[in-house]
Design a protein with these regions (language model features):
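Catalytic cores and adjacent flexible loops of soluble metabolic enzymes
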Residues: 1-324
Length: 324
């Protein structure tokens, strides 16, 4: 199973790198546009945001719950979440800017109204957040919209991933991927368990499997690429020290650029598995490898045998493996 997001085909071997801007714009349209440009400049294949309708996804008690702290943008949790949303006009500017500079832009839709508005804006894909993996009515709604789904599997059991898989397939959707994810911020390397990617590959044959990382640093995501992640998603911020819920577990633009550089180097290093004598190795082999030479002077007519031969550099003549 492969599918396309913009010019990129997912599931063909090249890792699709998503810069998750999320709500790291802090509700500011100008910051959102800067994040798009930062993602493009870093070499990301796509940039992703989040869209939610807070009053639709929170109970009244949850909406009105006092929410004070260093990362709060409102006196209540609902007000905080509202403050982190972009306006319709800002969303149009986001999509227009992404199209203009040539980077696919999509979003996590946290409710059906958000999904509908994103489709109207022309998103080329949806992300299903880990928080909605068990929200199968929402998954069903998005799977019927004719664009690919990228589904995160954080804070879930395997049986719940099975349920999401069944719901997606029942709609006829065959363009989707699962991302292994650990929903702690930040995730410690010992928690990450990257081998789950192979578990998911075996359980859902043909489905592209990737990794959504919330760890600090680059090593875990680079390891995911080495283990064959079809997609890698990392949060992007302009400043890790900024106020907001996700900045501390995000990469700044230079960190994202270095991550993408290293992922591409890993892909190049993995190669095709054929063992060959490389053209670039031949001068080194000629200089350092060994050839068969006669150990001592022998008279004319002497018939050489193996006791007369030793291996010495350079390696430009008969190899010692032909000694006998």
């Amino acid at each position: 199973m492969t599918f396309r997001i913009g010019p990129h085909e997912i599931g063909t071997g090249r890792c699709f790198v998503v810069a998750e801007a999320g709500v790291n714009h802090n509700g500011n349209a100008g910051t959102a546009l800067l994040l798009i440009r930062a993602a493009k400049d870093a070499g990301a294949d796509a940039v992703k945001f989040q869209r939610r309708t807070p009053h639709a996804i929170l109970t009244r008690a949850a909406y009105d719950r006092p929410y004070e702290g260093p990362n709060s943008y409102g006196a209540t949790y609902g007000a905080h979440r509202e403050a982190l949303e972009l306006s319709d006009a800002a969303w149009r500017s986001v999509m227009d800017t992404a199209a203009k500079i040539g980077i696919p832009c999509f979003a996590s839709a946290w409710d059906e109204a958000s999904a509908d508005s994103l489709i109207a804006l022309g998103v080329p894909a949806f992300k299903v957040a880990s928080a909605d993996l068990t929200n199968t009515p929402l998954i069903d709604h998005m799977a019927r919209m004719g664009v690919p789904l990228i589904v995160s599997t954080g804070m879930s059991a395997l049986a719940e991933v099975d349920d999401a898989y069944a719901v997606i397939r029942a709609t006829g959707c065959d363009q989707f991927a699962f991302l292994h994810c650990v929903s702690t911020y930040p995730a410690e390397p010992a928690m990450v368990n990257l081998r789950v990617m192979e578990t998911l590959r075996q359980r859902y044959p043909g489905v592209p499997i990737g990794y959504s990382g919330h760890e600090t640093g680059l090593a875990v995501s680079i390891a995911a690429a080495a283990l064959g992640a079809a997609i890698i998603e990392r949060h992007l911020t302009l400043n890790r020290a900024a106020k907001g819920p996700d900045h501390a577990a995000s990469l700044e633009p230079d960190g994202l650029r270095r991550l993408i550089r290293d992922i591409r180097n890993v892909e190049a290093a993995l190669g095709d598995g054929r063992k060959l004598l490389l053209y670039s190795e031949r001068p080194v082999r000629a200089r350092l490898a060994k050839s068969l030479v006669v150990a001592h002077d022998r008279p004319a007519g002497h018939v050489l045998d193996v006791t007369d031969l030793v291996a010495k550099s350079p390696g430009s003549a008969i190899a010692p493996r032909y000694r006998s």
